[in-house]
Amino acid sequence: MKASSQTAVPCLLMRGGTSKGPFYKAADLPSDKALRDKVLLAAMGSPDKRQIDGLGGAHPLTSKVGIVSQSTVPGVALDFLFAQLQPDNDTVDTTPNCGNMLAAVVPFALETGMLQVQGDQTTFRVLTLNTNMQCDITVDTTGGMVQYEGNARIDGAPGTSAPVVINFLDTAGSVCSGLLPTGKVRDTLTVTGQGFAPFTLDVTCIDNGMPLVMFKASDVGRTGYESVADMNADAELKTKIEALRLQVSVLMGLGDVSQKNYPKMTLIAAPQNGGALSTRSFIPHVCHDAIGVLAAVTVGTACVLEGSVCDGIAVMPTGAAKNVSVEHPTGEFSVALQTEPAPHLPGGQNVTQAALLRTARLLMRGEAMVPASLWSGPAA
């Protein structure tokens, strides 16, 4: 659909968890991937660190896009493709998942008529096309409509909202070859690079929904309790972390990740506020104000594995059902894990289920405008 010299692309601007961005129906975007990415970049105002000419919020957490379509997979209602854009470059990365944006998928589908309300609670299965991961998402639809007001609170988003419950069905090896892509619970590496002396540290490379490299903050000369501002201003630390990321990614089978936004890098320390573990996560070059959904699931999983870098630091509940509170700079993120003994596996435990609570909200409905010279819209 055109408006003057621009093409209007229908979308809903939505907050999903602690992220936000425009959501589109796949049919309203170009079918050609390269052209689609150019349209998304134009709509978001990238590349420009302020994203002044688009919808982006000048931060990786507000430079995200959701693309939704009806699924053809039996038993699955929706296909969801997540796209991570960056304010200051022209990359559109659809490799990793985003559990925060995932929270807004079913509300989007209900708001746009792709799905119908089932009752006071509505549950649909969603397939993430990024990694072929499936999950069941339940939203509050009391009164026959999506409810956004409620009493659920998540750290990193202001106020309270109606709950969105996400049950992940199979998250191990979302991008990597498996849960432990190096085949070990713990690896010892010596990191070299320009601008710092070589250093040796232990890492846990793990992917239970998001590829992470976890290591003790003390191994890079930090406490793990620094503020986000201090972390982002620490040029020496960021140089070391990036050198580690590029080096360890080869061991993880990810190859050259210099232009990728994974793996994420997570510094850990003993909990301070009654949780299981304290974290500071780089995504990968900016310190996260909180922690990503699937990163929290992956951190929680590492906490239950014997011999991981979390072993001896994390404070864990007993029993097969574990509620793991992952502390982050603005609060905590609780992940409900179901585990079973697995002596044949590295780490001795198998995580059979991961569930978590998020919230979402429709912020605006309308059309994103892109130059007609770039794309004239879907064929009639």
Where are these regions (language model features)?
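A glycine-rich beta-to-alpha transition motif near the start of alpha/beta enzyme domains, typified by
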Residues: 1-380
